[in-house]
Curated annotation (Swiss-Prot):
One of its GO terms (biological process) is tetrahydrofolate biosynthetic process. This is Aminodeoxychorismate synthase component 1. Belongs to the anthranilate synthase component I family. Monomer. Heterodimer consisting of two non-identical subunits: a glutamine amidotransferase subunit (PabA) and a aminodeoxychorismate synthase subunit (PabB). It catalyses: chorismate + L-glutamine = 4-amino-4-deoxychorismate + L-glutamate. SUPFAM superfamilies: ADC synthase (SSF56322). The active site is at E259, K275. The keyword Magnesium applies. Pfam families: Anth_synt_I_N (PF04715), Chorismate_bind (PF00425). It comes from Salmonella typhimurium (strain LT2 / SGSC1412 / ATCC 700720). Its cofactor is Mg(2+).
């Protein structure tokens, strides 16, 4: 089959809220997805990406991946990322990379935390009480790209771009009940239970069984109404550069993530793990001192360095030998609710490997598991009452042009069957303080739980 070199691009009138303007009428459609830069004051705030109406969908639940097109539905037990690579390569689109068009059609969606069970042997202790898929990916032959840096709105399509624009502007969202919580947030563990789990982790750490474990608690509330309204509210409150709204058949994912997982561009790999958190303070001088306190914290630096080493090892499994570098170590980045300690790891991917090979080697991200990764994941499955599902997985895209960019789905709400789920955790190391770690879980989600209560 002839390869199509590039999509047709039409430029639409600029408006800074173009992503919300065009997404609102389609947000109710299954497989409508929005990657939003959150209007963040952040280096990675340039693009918003909107898709809907995919040509193919891939849905993984446990061992089965279901591939649906307009004509066929097939079920396979193959490695889900291999299935994804095969489906991408089967489509006749192979554009050249364009720095102004990061996503030129391709795969976009959710890689849930529990997809990691396909790549590592893990226990089956935690309850699977959320019915959403482990992987939910659409393949799209069009997209809307909002470039906030150049103030350009581009609609790209491999077919009739004008017809796609007419389709997009003809959509009308149904009238929805306004969003509201119908119960208070409830944790899946008491303060006493958290303490017991914390001390179990400490025992494993002091015995040398592991070096760091990310222990979380999950908050749940019932709700009614429009999840898109909830996302708009959260987006204004959090302004996170890797935000996303995914509409699935049986629910929605509302992500306000500050963290990049892996980017691949022209063979260059970048990952930016977050490890180390302190809450923002209202007084500017006290807030600057808080940032300096985080920068100087030996505990947080040690915690961060463990994950840097883990990510170097994960990426090194597939990178060109000798190419793994750490250009940034222990950088403090401010966000609306918290200061984070961030490091950057870079490498090169051999031409012989695909973005899915890189994703498989590093999934799930080390910043939300611990070290060593597999042992930490075993402990997480034993101590956390329920599976993580979408939380601590990844949301992102693999473009037909070869570029990949993905987030870590922290600060993320799962909405399904009238219930909201939102988790928060922290990396526990040998000298962690129980009360400080417990409080950190609240510091991380206050900007999510409270806006939804109002």
């Amino acid at each position: 089959m002839m390869k199509t070199l590039s999509p047709t691009v039409i430029t639409l009138p600029w408006r800074p809220d173009a992503a919300e303007h065009y997404f609102a009428p389609v947000n109710h459609l299954p497989w409508a997805m929005l990657l939003h830069s959150g209007d963040a004051i952040h280096p990675y705030n340039r693009f918003d990406i909107l898709v809907a109406d995919p040509v193919t969908t891939l849905t993984t639940r446990a061992q089965e991946t279901t591939v649906c097109t307009a004509r066929t539905t097939t079920v396979t037990l193959d490695d889900p990322l291999h299935v994804l690579q095969t489906q991408l390569e089967a489509l006749p689109f192979h554009p050249q990379p364009d720095p102004d068009l990061p996503f030129q059609g391709g795969a976009l969606g959710l890689f849930g935390y529990d997809l990691g069970r396909r790549f590592e042997i893990l226990p089956d202790t935690a309850a699977r009480d959320i019915a959403l898929p482990d992987m939910a990916i659409g393949l799209y032959d069009w997209a809307l790209i909002v470039d906030h840096q150049k103030q350009v709105v581009s609609l790209i399509s491999y077919h009739d771009a004008d017809a796609r624009y007419r389709w997009l502007t003809s959509q009308r969202a149904p009238t929805r009940t306004p969003f509201r919580l119908t119960s208070a947030w409830q944790s899946n563990m008491t303060r006493c239970e958290y303490g017991e789990k914390f001390r179990q982790v400490q025992a494993w750490l002091h015995s040398g069984d592991c070096y760091q474990v990310n222990l979380s608690q999950r908050f749940q509330a019932s709700y009614e109404g429009d999840e898109w309204q909830a996302f708009e509210r959260l987006n204004r409150a959090n302004r996170a550069p890797f935000s996303a709204f995914l509409r699935l058949h049986d629910g929605a994912i509302l992500s306000l993530s500050p963290e990049r997982f892996i980017q691949l561009e022209n063979g260059h790999i970048q990952t930016r793990p977050i490890k180390g958190t302190l809450p923002r303070l209202n007084d500017p001088q006290a807030d600057r001192q808080q940032a300096q306190k985080l920068a100087n914290s030996m505990k947080d630096r040690a915690e961060n360095l463990m994950i840097v080493d883990l990510m170097r090892n994960d990426i090194g499994r597939v990178a060109v030998p000798g190419s793994v570098k750490v250009p940034e170590l222990f950088v403090v980045e401010p966000f609306p609710a918290v200061h984070h300690l961030v490091s950057t790891i870079t490498a090169r991917l051999p031409d012989s490997l695909h973005a899915t090979d890189l994703l498989r080697a590093a999934f799930p991200g080390g910043s939300i598991t611990g070290a060593p990764k597999v042992r930490a994941m075993e402990i997480i499955d034993e101590l956390e009452p329920q599976r993580r599902n979408a939380w601590c997985g990844s949301i992102g895209y693999l473009s037909f042009c070869g570029k990949m960019d993905t987030s870590i789905t922290i600060r993320t709400v799962t909405a399904t069957q009238g219930q909201l789920y939102c988790s928060a955790g922290g990396g526990i190391v040998a000298d962690s303080n129980e009360e400080a770690e417990y409080q950190e879980t609240f510091d991380k989600v206050n900007r999510i739980l409270h806006p939804l209560e109002n």
